[in-house]
Structures are given as structure tokens and as C-alpha cells.
């Protein structure tokens, strides 16, 4: 009996072909070899094999899929993932990105994986790049042996951590540390049953509120879920903030500042990614990002000190129309 392949699922967060997440393997993986799976669908059996004569990079271990479900812009059937407060106050980008993952965990596809006794799934958002996937085989074996439920492959907070050996061999030296409130859905490996249990608990509790990361950490504690974070994960999974920053500017109303922002995103991707990160929604009418918050504080400053410069008010107005 053939071994069950581990699904590698690409979740689109920007307009980009799924194969660009794996740039060095176009001879094995191209866009036609990615199955598109969406809501109420299961994986077709024909994609069980990637045909290559030799497999030094382990690509026969996996079946490659692009998840196209969970689009909250299509309809409102994903509102049950969020509380009434979050549906009003959480930003559109936050809800959109979280809904994609929760809809995947809650899909018929994941139920089918559980029925087929598939233990783990690798999930990668398409603003990441993985140039060498040979680390996945020993990592999957190690997290099975160590009973790890979730391996997060993007670090949110760096610093001194108590690290534990995960994989030590001639090719890889990988360590992990226990996750807390530093939750990221950018790139991770998750046990199928764990994903099903988490999304079931979220729905039963009335949906996520604004504190998504705190709630996920709370659920993990209550359900005794072992989530580890890969130390120095950028060595294996490279997140490109430029792609998201450019995407945010491209989806803004075309104006002078959006054009300036697109250019700045190429030169200062990390800074522009941070500045364009949405913080809160104003009752679902519009989202306020970091730049928008700075503009609001600047307006308050000008009102308090009764600034009468027409140029400053004009420039502030252009920022308001562009970023708020």
C-alpha cells in the first residue's frame, strides 16, 4: 500500500501564482500541478503522483494544492467565524486572511484528510518563498515523534528563548521554542485533528473577537495543544513583506500617495509593510492602518495647537483621503 502523501497547501493572500512560492523547482512543480480546492470540494485522486525520474528534493512526498476557498468577499457565510464585535471592528484584511485558514480547517477537504488518516498538513501563504523543501521530511518525522500539534514556521517576536532540538542531521540543525501569544498563520504545519478541533471550538464559542492571537493562545491552553515555533525560520521560509506592501498600495484608490507608496515599498519593504498594516476598522466603514493612525494623531496635534498653515492642512487632507 502506497504511503499517504502530505498535502502542501498554498493559501493566496496576494495575486501571485502558487508555483512562485517554490521558485527553484519549476522542473517538478508548475501551476498546472497545483490542484485548486475550494469550499465544499475534496481533493481529486489524480493528483497523487508527481512524475519525476529521480527525487533528490523529496517532491514525491507531497501533493501540492492551492486553496481558493474562504473568500469573505464572495458572500457572508464566514461571519460565524467572528463575533459580532469583530465583524464590526476587525479590519477587512484581518478577517479575510483568518477566514481563509478557518474555512480550510472547516472544509470537507480536511474532513476527508482525517478519514484518510493524513496526520499533518503543510500550509503556506503565497507571500512566502521556500527554496528548498528537503527540511520538511525530517521535520514531519520529528514533530510526529515529539507529539507536536502545530509547528509555526514564521517568527513574530525574536529574542532569547529556551530552545529545544527538533532536527539534527548532516543537512539541517533545527530548534524550536514553545509559542505563546506570538501566533502567525503565515506558514505552519498543523495536525489535521488539531485544526478541526480548533475551528470547532471557535464556532461553538461564538466566533473570534478582536483579540485573535490571545484567543488562539487561550484555546491552545484549554485544549493542551503543543505549538512550537521554528527558531531562525527565515532560513527555510522567507517572508517577503514587499509583496504584501505593494499589494496594499495597489488595492488603494489610485492617487499620488499610493504611487509614492508603491515605489517606497520596493526600496523599504519592511517599513512600508509596517506602516500599511491595518489596525482597526471604523464600524466596518473603513480600516485605519498605522499611517492613518499617525495622520489622526497629527490632526489632533494641529487642532490642539491651532495650526493655521493652509499647506499643512492641505497635505493632511491628501493623506486622509489616501490612507483612511
UniProtKB/Swiss-Prot annotation:
The chain crosses the membrane at residues 285-305. Pfam families: Pox_P35 (PF03213). It is found in: Virion membrane. Induction: Expressed in the late phase of the viral replicative cycle. One of its GO terms (cellular component) is membrane. One of its GO terms (biological process) is virion attachment to host cell. Coiled coil: none annotated. InterPro entries: Poxvirus_P35 (IPR004900). Does not contain disulfide bonds. It is a single-pass membrane protein. Keywords: Host-virus interaction, Late protein, Membrane, Transmembrane, Transmembrane helix, Viral attachment to host cell, Viral envelope protein, Virion, Virus entry into host cell. Belongs to the orthopoxvirus OPG108 family. Envelope protein that binds to heparan sulfate on the cell surface and might provide virion attachment to target cell. This is Envelope protein OPG108.
Amino acid at each position: 500500500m502506497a504511503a499517504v502523501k502530505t498535502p502542501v497547501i498554498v493559501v493566496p493572500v496576494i495575486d501571485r501564482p502558487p508555483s512562485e512560492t517554490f521558485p527553484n523547482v519549476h522542473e517538478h512543480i508548475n501551476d498546472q500541478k497545483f490542484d485548486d480546492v475550494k469550499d465544499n470540494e475534496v481533493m481529486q485522486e489524480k493528483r497523487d503522483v508527481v512524475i519525476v525520474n529521480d527525487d533528490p528534493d523529496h517532491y514525491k512526498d507531497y501533493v501540492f494544492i492551492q486553496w481558493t476557498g474562504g473568500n469573505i468577499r464572495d458572500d457572508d457565510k464566514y461571519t460565524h467565524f467572528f463575533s459580532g464585535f469583530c465583524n464590526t471592528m476587525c479590519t477587512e484584511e484581518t478577517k479575510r486572511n483568518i477566514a481563509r485558514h478557518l474555512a480550510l480547517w472547516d472544509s470537507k477537504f480536511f474532513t476527508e484528510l482525517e478519514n484518510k488518516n493524513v496526520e499533518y498538513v503543510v500550509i503556506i501563504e503565497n507571500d512566502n518563498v521556500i527554496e528548498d523543501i528537503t527540511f520538511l521530511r525530517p521535520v514531519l518525522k520529528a514533530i510526529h515523534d515529539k507529539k507536536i500539534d502545530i509547528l509555526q514556521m514564521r517568527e513574530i517576536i525574536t529574542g532569547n528563548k529556551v530552545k529545544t532540538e527538533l532536527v539534527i542531521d548532516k543537512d539541517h540543525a533545527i530548534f524550536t521554542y514553545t509559542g505563546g501569544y506570538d501566533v502567525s498563520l503565515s506558514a505552519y504545519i498543523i495536525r489535521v485533528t488539531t485544526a478541526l478541533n480548533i475551528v470547532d471550538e471557535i464556532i461553538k464559542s461564538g466566533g473570534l473577537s478582536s483579540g485573535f492571537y490571545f484567543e488562539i493562545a487561550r484555546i491552545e491552553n484549554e485544549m493542551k495543544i503543543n505549538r512550537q515555533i521554528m527558531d531562525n525560520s527565515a532560513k527555510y521560509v522567507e517572508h517577503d513583506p514587499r509583496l504584501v506592501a505593494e499589494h496594499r498600495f495597489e488595492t488603494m484608490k489610485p492617487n499620488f500617495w499610493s504611487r509614492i507608496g508603491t515605489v517606497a515599498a520596493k526600496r523599504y519593504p519592511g517599513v512600508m509593510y509596517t506602516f500599511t498594516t491595518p489596525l482597526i476598522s471604523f464600524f466596518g466603514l473603513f480600516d485605519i492602518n498605522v499611517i492613518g493612525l499617525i495622520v489622526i494623531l497629527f490632526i489632533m496635534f494641529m487642532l490642539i495647537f491651532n495650526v493655521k498653515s493652509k499647506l499643512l492642512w492641505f497635505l493632511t487632507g491628501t493623506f486622509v483621503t489616501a490612507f483612511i
